[in-house]
Amino acid sequence: MIDLAAKPFYLKPEDIEWVNTTLAGMTTEEKAGQLFCVLFKECKPEEFEYVFNILKPGGCMYRVVPTERAIAATQNIYSRSKVPPLIAANLEKGGNGIVTEGTLVGAPMEIAATDDIGMATKMAHACAAEASAVGANWAFAPIIDIDTNYRNPITNTLSLIHI
């Protein structure tokens, strides 16, 4: 048995009780659904209806949508979930990775070009604030990537280090 009071969880007794009660109340299908993270391209109600009637995923990822739609999507997902879901987004360049009104801060290479480590911290705070405002709690984008293939047009601007 996993000790939920120990590292890395450090849960309080009431939180451990919630975990045990929630897990005991889940069907095998609901437990299996927790393994899935579904991509929602447009965050439209019909997408949720289909996915949650069949799969009941433990997480999802939004593509860039207007703020109001992202908030409505988060509320929709939470209302259908027994377990608080993981809601992911690509935030490597800013809050614009989840909502159309989000701030484009810059690629990690641009942040590194400032030669100011504090800029990476400021970027992370801006990304976290904008993403969490619409319910995201999981970033699917590295702040640091290592560019081992200079021909790769994606990782080269997401990288701080070229080797």
Model-derived features: where do they sit?
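Preference for extracellular/luminal or secreted protein segments
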Residues: 1-56, 162-163
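Enzymes and membrane/adaptor proteins characterized by extended Gly/Ser/Thr/Asp/Glu-rich
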Residues: 41-161
